[in-house]
Amino acid sequence: MKLISQPLDFFGQNIYNAVTVRAGEDGKAVRAVRYDGFPQTAIGWPVTPEVLYWAPKFMQERYKKPFMITENGMASHDWVGVDGKVHDQARVDFMARYLGAYKRAAEDGVDLAGYFAWSVMDNFEWAYGYSQRFGLVYTDYNTQKRIWKDSAYFYKNIIETNGENL
């Protein structure tokens, strides 16, 4: 127990979208807001970038530890265009909005320890198999050929500039 009860170095969390709750009549959490009218991912999840501002802010205030996004991203219907490239503008927009909110948290003093995109490459997902694409790099499942999507180039630029272009 002594070994596994050491203090945490940081708090990490996978975050994809916000869920707003309120106390129900029995005191248990009840979903309070439906995100009708919000943009959605290919699997119907609402696009709520402000969650990358409020979640790190809340968690740092509560736990006093640096905060890390251990997974954030979206499913999209991606394909290789006639130019041989993958133009996943929805994912670029998603990342710009979410990383912009994350940057705002840093500017407001939240100690951010990192961000990991979901996922580097299109892959097998337990809930969706190969039917959805989550990666920054397109995977041709028949040939295993990889093609950088526009979102990969966008994220590369974010990393190179430490988010200055957000």
Could you tell me what each predicted segment is?
Residues 1-166:
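Non-catalytic scaffold segments within catalytic domains of secreted glycoside hydrolases
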